Regions:
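Hydrophobic transmembrane alpha-helices and their immediate loop junctions
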Residues: 1-227
Length: 227
């Protein structure tokens, strides 16, 4: 079921699938397998394309507004890298912090659906998730789940502040960062919906105060950005 992995931290160790030594994980908390890097890059590229097509107006916009598509491609790349890729990496590093093997796996049917929806001018995606091998406690699971939306919240605040500072003398850059902030806050807020398999369901099962605190913060910034 799982292909063999060679431990990048202990040359003499040969690892099978999820049975990754905690000693190696703790020595280098930033490990990525070759397959994982490939799948994360593929998922990011496909999502970037889907976002750009949807923002252009779908297939019709792609045909008649191809110059706009090129601009949206740049914007979408920054938005997807920060709002999606760093969100997933946040989950991964939080899991590694607790000593678990964690690896991003893409979901190709979900990525294909994202492309199909984008041609109609809409966005719906199930790009994949970080798979954790082990049995985290409710607390650990809640913290791991909270890491993703927390990354989105932090990046949203950062890019929103950057946008506000640039608006007066670099309005185009300000608009770009405003857009990236909006996508981060939107994705963070969506993931806080307390329904499985979204992050919110795991956070609320661990700590209602933490869930409410994060949800309120995201709701406040969602209001400021979109209204």
């Amino acid at each position: 079921l799982f292909p063999p992995y060679h431990d990048p931290f202990e040359e003499e160790t040969f690892i099978i699938g999820p049975y990754y030594t905690q000693r190696a994980v703790r020595r280098s908390p930033f490990y990525f397998t070759e397959r994982e890097k490939h799948e994360l890059m593929v998922a990011t590229a496909i999502l970037t394309l889907a976002f750009a097509i949807a923002f252009t107006g779908g297939l019709r916009g792609l045909i008649f507004r191809w110059r706009s598509f090129i601009l949206y491609l740049v914007v979408a790349a920054l938005a997807v890298i920060t709002a999606f890729a760093l969100h997933e990496i946040g989950h991964k590093f939080a899991a590694i912090h607790f000593g678990y093997w964690a690896e991003f796996n893409y979901f190709m049917p979900g990525l294909f659906i994202a492309l199909l929806f984008s041609l109609a001018g809409f966005l719906f995606a199930a790009p994949g998730a970080v798979v954790i091998h082990g049995y985290p406690t409710r607390r650990e699971n809640g913290i791991i789940a909270a890491a993703g939306p927390s990354v989105n919240l932090a990046l949203g605040i950062f890019f929103f502040s950057l946008s506000s500072g640039l608006n007066s003398f670099a309005p185009l850059a300000g608009l770009l960062f405003y857009f990236v902030a909006a996508i981060n806050i939107l994705i963070g807020a969506f993931n806080m919906i307390p329904l499985p398999p979204l992050d919110g369901s795991k956070i609320i099962a661990w700590s209602l105060p933490v869930y409410l605190g994060m949800a309120v913060l995201l709701a406040i910034f969602l209001f400021f950005i979109y209204f």
